[in-house]
Every structure is written in structure tokens, then in C-alpha cells.
Design a protein with these regions (language model features):
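Amphipathic alpha-helical interaction segments
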Residues: 28-32, 36, 56-59, 78-81, ...
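C-terminal catalytic subdomain
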Residues: 71-136, 142
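Hydrophobic faces of stable alpha-helices that mediate helix-helix packing
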Residues: 7, 11, 31-34, 38, ...
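Hydrophobic alpha-helical packing residues
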Residues: 37, 41, 64, 117, ...
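Carboxylate- and glycine-rich phosphate/diphosphate-binding segment that chelates Mg2+/Mn2+
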Residues: 1-71
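C-terminal charged capping/lid subdomain of soluble metabolic enzymes
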Residues: 114, 124-204
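Short acidic/histidine-centered micro-motifs embedded in hydrophobic/aromatic stretches
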Residues: 33, 60, 117-120, 168
Length: 204
């Protein structure tokens, strides 16, 4: 629970920051949240009795909440909500698994923003080339997932459900969420295929 709810807060902050409806205040909140999460989530996970780490994670969750309440979220949440509704997949777990896939799919459009998040997370500095910093931030998320034993797949997904699930995600996200790259229901299907275990993964 500590790991997945912590990564849920991270997803709130990241999606709020990379979207197209930010303000100076929401950007600051998101950066503060990312910094606190990268500084404290591992400790809170490995030492649940560490009150300082848990207190800082509460602050991070608050800052991330302030950010996305005004700036909204994106396709990570839209897809995750469909998985929760269909299969009862825990929301934080779905977000954690999805986040790197969606960030990579957005491509260069968000590299500059990911670079700023990488600096906040402590995985890059202001002198790091933008593309390198962006890739480093996504890798840091993958590494965090691995440390927490969070995998890359959602085994509950059934291929025959994918058109319906992508329709739900599309209706939630478009036009409500100010995503950096627009995708329709057909394009969103790829994320569900990516989340299927490798032996069943038939994405083309």
C-alpha cells in the first residue's frame, strides 16, 4: 500500500506538470511533490515506522493533490480508471505500471518538462541535456517500480475487453484532460496490449 499509493501521488504530480493546463502554482506544487517522493518513498517503504518519511509523503501527496485538482491528469489515469472499474485493479498499482509506458508514448513533446522533473527528483541537473534528463526520469520511475516489486503487466486484462476499455478511457480523457498529446480510442488500445503478460501480448 505504501508503494502503490506513493506512486499514485507521483502520477498525480507528473500528469499535472506535463499537461497543457498548468499555472505557476501547480507547477511548483508538482515539482515539490516529486522532490519529496524521490527523497522519502523508499524510506517509507522499507521502514514503515519512520515517521519523518511518512510525514513527508503526506506533504507530497498534498502538493500533488493541489497540482492535479487545478491542472487535471491524463491518459495514465484514464486507462487506470478503466482497469479499476473492469477488474478491480488497485488504482495506485495501475498508475505505477502504466506511468512509464504513457510517458514514453508522449515522446519529445514532454521532454523539456520531464527534464525539469528529473532535476526535482535528483536524477539530473540543469546542465544535463534535455533528452538525457527526460530518459533518466522515466528510467528512475522504472527503477523505483522494480525496487517495490511492481511489475510491468496487469494480468487481469482480457483481449476481448480492450475495445470497451479503450472507449471508456477515451470518453473520460477527451476532451476533459489537457493531455500533451491527443490520442483516440484506437490509439489508447496499445496501452492495454502493452500491459498484457508477454506470452499473450499480441500488439502489432
Amino acid at each position: 500500500i505504501t508503494a502503490t499509493t506513493g506512486m499514485d501521488a507521483l502520477t498525480h504530480a507528473v500528469e499535472a506538470y506535463i499537461g497543457n493546463s498548468t499555472t505557476p502554482g501547480t507547477r511548483k506544487n508538482a515539482l515539490d511533490a516529486v522532490k519529496l517522493i524521490f527523497e522519502n518513498l523508499d524510506t517509507a517503504y522499507t521502514d514503515g515506522s519512520n515517521k519523518e518519511a511518512r510525514r513527508n509523503m503526506l506533504r507530497a501527496s498534498y502538493f500533488a493533490g493541489c497540482a492535479f485538482t487545478k491542472s487535471y491528469v491524463g491518459y495514465v489515469h484514464a486507462v487506470a480508471h478503466s482497469l479499476g472499474g473492469q477488474y478491480n485493479v488497485p488504482h495506485g498499482l495501475a498508475n505505477a505500471v502504466l506511468l512509464p509506458y504513457v510517458l514514453e508514448a508522449y515522446g519529445k513533446t514532454i521532454h523539456k518538462k520531464l527534464a525539469a522533473l528529473a532535476v526535482a527528483a535528483g536524477v539530473a541537473d540543469t546542465e544535463t541535456p534535455v533528452e538525457e534528463a527526460a530518459a533518466g526520469f522515466i528510467q528512475a520511475i522504472k527503477d523505483m517500480k522494480a525496487r517495490f516489486g511492481i511489475g510491468d503487466f496487469i494480468p487481469e486484462i482480457q483481449e476481448e475487453d480492450i475495445p470497451k476499455l479503450s472507449h471508456y478511457a477515451d470518453k473520460e480523457a477527451n476532451p476533459l484532460y489537457p493531455v500533451p498529446v491527443l490520442m483516440d480510442a484506437g490509439e489508447l488500445e496499445k496501452f492495454y496490449y502493452m500491459l498484457m503478460p508477454a506470452k499473450e501480448n499480441t500488439v502489432q
